[in-house]
Amino acid sequence: MLIYNTLTRRLQEFNEMHRGRVNLFVCGPTVQDHFHIGHARTYIFFDAVAKFLKLEGYSVFYLQNITDIDDKIINRAKEMGIEPSEVAKIYFSEFQEDMKRLKVDSVNFFARATLYIDEIVSQISRMMEKGYAYETDDGVYFEVRKFKDYGELSNQSLDQIIAGYRVAVNENKRNPEDFVLWKKKKAGEPSWPSPWGEGRPGWHIEDTAITETYFGDEYDIHGGGSDLIFPHHEAEIAQMRSISGKRYLAHYWIHTGMININKEKMSKSLKNFITIRDILKDYRPEDLRFAILNANYRTQIEFSKELMEESKKLIDYINDTYRKLEYVNGSGNFKIDVNSVISEMRSLAENDFDFHSVIVKLLAITGEINRNFEGINKEVAEELKKVYLWVDTFLGILEQKKEVSKGIVDDLVELRTRMRKEKNFLISDAIRDVLKKNGIHIEDRGDVTVWWQE
């Protein structure tokens, strides 16, 4: 299996650290507002990654942090007139609900930052002991110039990074590029005890404290949006490697591209900010999963109504065809080598999680099924369903429908056929309309009528 590694900027063969086991960490959200389709892109993609790795036979532990204290949460609490912890509780619950609706259910554990203060303090203390961190009047900072590989992930030299920080925004810091590890307490803000006085953690430190707790000082895969490469992920590497002295924090770094809305960057200031809840008012979870997974994960997605409408149409096409296979009554000898098809799809997905090519292959098979439908018998139909179910294991694009009573529908279809033969079109049309209202699609093929659930 090949993975594009942001750290090395090339495709690399995937070799797990521990045979058959993969430790995967993806940066979770800051729980202070409604979640948008940019979040959806990252979490849907890594949900598919985790599920595909499991399908490949790996035992996957998928860990995600939850930032439940930071400046944004504190400011949001002031706006809402409640405690920061309440803000975090409200929006973490909303996040879980959104993910459930999107079929993102592969995360093994959500680690809330405020439950790891002791681990955070331990890491900062070790950085100070090794000379990488220092205390000031307002907090504790990491001295970037001490870590010579800083900038490797984002493909910048340390000199370039230093040159980019020309103005010191905090006179307490030794150098403008240094980042905060611990913020000393301010009036009215939540705080926890530490050797440097009451305070709270900086943003970057929570992730390495959490991953060290569960994975140790290095692990297999770290994921997140490409907007986190610098400075967030760069800082994570500096923190953990300054303590461990090892070459890697994560062996593979995977980053998803950003989303543009109507060819403009999605942002609140441009008022083109789309929440997950808003998009799900007009489209199904499967439509959004399809739109996201049908794009190369490293590219930008040009998000638009046209994209969603096309995704909706193709999801209908895939699901209608899959459901038709439930009710096939052909007697022909049409065949497809299902094992070969699945093997080809597996190879496509193994090439840097190329889910787009998997979807292209699925659509090609779907077209072939529809062109040869009358030549498909029940045994072949059962085999063909395996292709859709295999793909759905990680892409999650088959729509869940309430089952209808096959016996009742068969009786109604038989009655309608009899009424048509007797030219009693009033009743036959009425039966058709009743079936349609209940999501049953019927198709007359000469003297034979086939039906499937839409």
Swiss-Prot record:
The keyword Repeat does not apply. GO terms for cellular component: cytoplasm. Belongs to the class-I aminoacyl-tRNA synthetase family. Its main location: cytoplasm. Its EC number is 6.1.1.16. Its cofactor is Zn(2+). It catalyses: tRNA(Cys) + L-cysteine + ATP = L-cysteinyl-tRNA(Cys) + AMP + diphosphate. One of its GO terms (molecular function) is metal ion binding. This is Cysteine--tRNA ligase. A motif ('HIGH' region) lies at residues 29-39. The lineage of its organism: Archaea, Methanobacteriati, Thermoplasmatota, Thermoplasmata, Thermoplasmatales. ATP binds at K268.
